Amino acid sequence: MNARRCVAVLGFAFLACACPLPPPLPPKAGPPPPPGEIVLDHGFIVLQLHTPPGPAGPKPTVISFLADQELLLAAGVVVATYRLEWKLVEAFRPPEPPPAPGAHPVGQWLLAAPSPKTVGKGFFGVITTNAESAIPKIVDYLATRPEVDAARIGVAGNSTYGFTALQAAAADPRLTAAVSLVASGDYRCFLNLSNLAMAGKPLDLDPVYARWLDEHDPVRHPERLVHTALLMVNGKDDPAVPLACAERTARVLRGAYQRAGVPERFRFQLAGGGHVIEEAARRETLAWFQRWLIHPGS
């Protein structure tokens, strides 16, 4: 089983890449996908391409998790959106070990865990499956399409998918531009300070989980990102993704881009407000892709 397939098969499990389970059989043939949908990875990835009317020839393309695609389409960008069919791999998810005696649940939403030892494990499992398994397969496919310029593929996302965009850019050097909105690349800081995780209480992760987390954490491997023109935009008053974590991420990444001799390829922008910064994000996202993906070098 190759590494990408193993990650996809086990989804939420943070030990997925190391598990010895055999690969699943391809699902039985079902009805054809709806018009416009492209099925990849035995049906696990369902992709849609939104193509602008012009210009002719290969175009810049953005794998986008953003709700508003119209600005990119109007700028002549192919927009790729997708979903993952988790139900196809749920049966291969290994059971979670029982919590230790006396453990107390922590966290909220996808970051919830039966004890502080594994806070955020499911959240980062979802991110890693998207960033390091699904998106590289989508890039493989995009490179075969005549309307796509394979040298100008980017990724953009906000919140959970802002984390995904950041980690995907670190994992795949073919992504030449990225926009990460209201996210952080310092995973330990995020788990420590976010009101969705430990909310400032001490972080005490299981050692195996901690090692896995550090391997995928962008701030611990900032050199993996310097091939990508990266924009980060964060809210100043965001309890979900605290400013301190965004600023730590920016400080580490800015240093990496400077050491690589390309400081202009990284930008960190603060917006007023909290976790919802749509208007600022729209402006900054389009301007960044105009500079680095649509008209690079101009």
Residue ranges and their predicted role:
Residues 8-17:
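Bacterial N-terminal signal peptides
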Residues 136-199:
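Primarily recognizes the serine-hydrolase "nucleophile elbow" in alpha/beta-hydrolase
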